[in-house]
């Protein structure tokens, strides 16, 4: 399963795996718009159930411009993830440059009421012409 995902990070037994894909059909390079989809899997290898409450993304374009995005849950959900369970979702990111990267954190709450941040690994956003 790891082969599907290019990047991963682990915090307190919560593993976040990420893979990004360039979407040429939604991109308009001649208008300065490139678009990627990213697939995230959150796996709970801890002994307690956790709930994802919020997300915080830092998106950096190819010129070094940074944009911060915060919000409740992911794709309209605040999933509960039991020990041994996982949650997958797909979302997208536009940029005004053909390269960039994303990274961030998820705010989680454990069943005992304690909250903690889980790292989302840094992953590259690269348009194919830039790759090679």
Model region roles, listed by residue range:
Residues 2-4, 22-26, 54, 72-77, ...:
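Short structured motifs
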Residues 2-33:
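Low-complexity, acidic Ser/Thr/Pro/Gly-rich terminal tails and inter-domain linkers that flank the onset
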Residues 6, 94-132:
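Terminal connector regions
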Residues 14, 34-36, 40, 53, ...:
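Hydrophobic core residues within well-ordered beta-strands of beta-rich domains
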Residues 27-28, 49, 96-100:
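Short glycine/serine/proline-enriched coil/turn segments at secondary-structure junctions
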Residues 42-46:
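Asparagine-centered strand-capping/turn motif at beta-strand->loop junctions
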Residues 48-67:
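Short acidic, flexible loop segments centered on an aromatic residue
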Residues 67-99:
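Intrinsically disordered, low-complexity Pro/Gly/Ser/Thr-rich segments with frequent PxxP/GP/PP motifs
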């Amino acid at each position: 399963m790891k082969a599907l995902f290019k990047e991963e990070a682990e915090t307190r037994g919560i593993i976040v795996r990420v893979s990004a894909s360039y979407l040429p059909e939604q991109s308009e390079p001649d208008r300065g718009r490139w678009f990627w989809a990213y697939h995230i899997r959150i796996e709970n290898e801890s002994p307690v159930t956790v709930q994802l409450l919020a997300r915080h993304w830092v998106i950096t374009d190819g010129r070094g411009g940074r944009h911060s995005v915060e919000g409740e849950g992911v794709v309209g959900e605040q999933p509960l993830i039991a020990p041994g369970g996982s949650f997958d979702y797909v979302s997208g990111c536009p940029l005004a440059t053909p390269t960039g990267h994303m990274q961030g954190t998820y705010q989680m709450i454990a069943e005992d009421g304690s909250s903690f941040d889980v790292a989302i690994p840094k992953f590259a956003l690269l348009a194919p012409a830039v790759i090679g």
